[in-house]
């Protein structure tokens, strides 16, 4: 089966690099499935799981926003943060998830938005960690 090269990169460095059969991500415009030979595309990403299919198995990567760049022979995910399912510290993610009080108090709009994003990232990381 044909493959497409995938690179997942964060400001801290590369997280994943391999050839896969299919990439599935959640963009701001909706779900995208990328196969080898896909037309060029750039799309902003949601906080979600990137699914990388290879050899009948699926690997999951928690992606915290960023951009997807697609070329016919490669896909690059430029993420603000990204973690492979097996690398996620579940206890830390659960601690973040339980920190909902800043959302409830809404003391400051900026604090609320930061807390909301932290909660989304924690919930995404837990979801991806459960998929491994």
UniProtKB/Swiss-Prot annotation:
This is ATP synthase epsilon chain. Produces ATP from ADP in the presence of a proton gradient across the membrane. Keywords: ATP synthesis, Cell membrane, CF(1), Hydrogen ion transport, Ion transport, Membrane, Transport. GO terms for molecular function: ATP binding; proton-transporting ATP synthase activity, rotational mechanism. The lineage of its organism: Bacteria, Bacillati, Bacillota, Bacilli, Bacillales. Coiled coil: none annotated. It is found in: Cell membrane. F-type ATPases have 2 components, CF(1) - the catalytic core - and CF(0) - the membrane proton channel. CF(1) has five subunits: alpha(3), beta(3), gamma(1), delta(1), epsilon(1). CF(0) has three main subunits: a, b and c. Signal peptide: none annotated. Pfam families: ATP-synt_DE (PF00401), ATP-synt_DE_N (PF02823). Its main location: membrane. InterPro entries: ATP_F1_dsu/esu_C_sf (IPR036794), ATP_synth_F1_dsu/esu (IPR001469), ATP_synth_F1_dsu/esu_N (IPR020546), ATP_synth_F1_esu_C (IPR020547), ATPsynth_dsu/esu_N (IPR036771). It comes from Bacillus sp. (strain PS3). PANTHER family: ATP SYNTHASE DELTA/EPSILON CHAIN, ATP SYNTHASE EPSILON CHAIN, CHLOROPLASTIC. GO terms for cellular component: plasma membrane; proton-transporting ATP synthase complex. Belongs to the ATPase epsilon chain family. HAMAP family: ATP_synth_epsil_bac.
């Amino acid at each position: 089966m044909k493959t497409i090269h995938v690179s997942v990169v964060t400001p801290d460095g590369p997280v994943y690099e391999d050839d896969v059969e299919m990439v599935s991500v959640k963009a701001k415009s909706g779900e995208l499935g990328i196969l080898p030979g896909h037309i060029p595309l750039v799309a902003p990403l949601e906080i979600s799981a990137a699914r990388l299919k290879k050899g009948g198995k699926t690997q999951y990567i928690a992606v915290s926003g960023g951009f997807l760049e697609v070329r016919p022979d490669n896909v690059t995910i430029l993420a603000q943060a990204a973690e492979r399912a097996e690398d996620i510290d579940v206890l830390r993610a659960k601690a973040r998830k339980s920190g909902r009080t800043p959302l409830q108090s809404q003391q400051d709009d900026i604090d609320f938005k930061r807390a909301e994003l932290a909660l989304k990232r924690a919930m995404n990381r837990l979801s991806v960690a459960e998929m491994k």
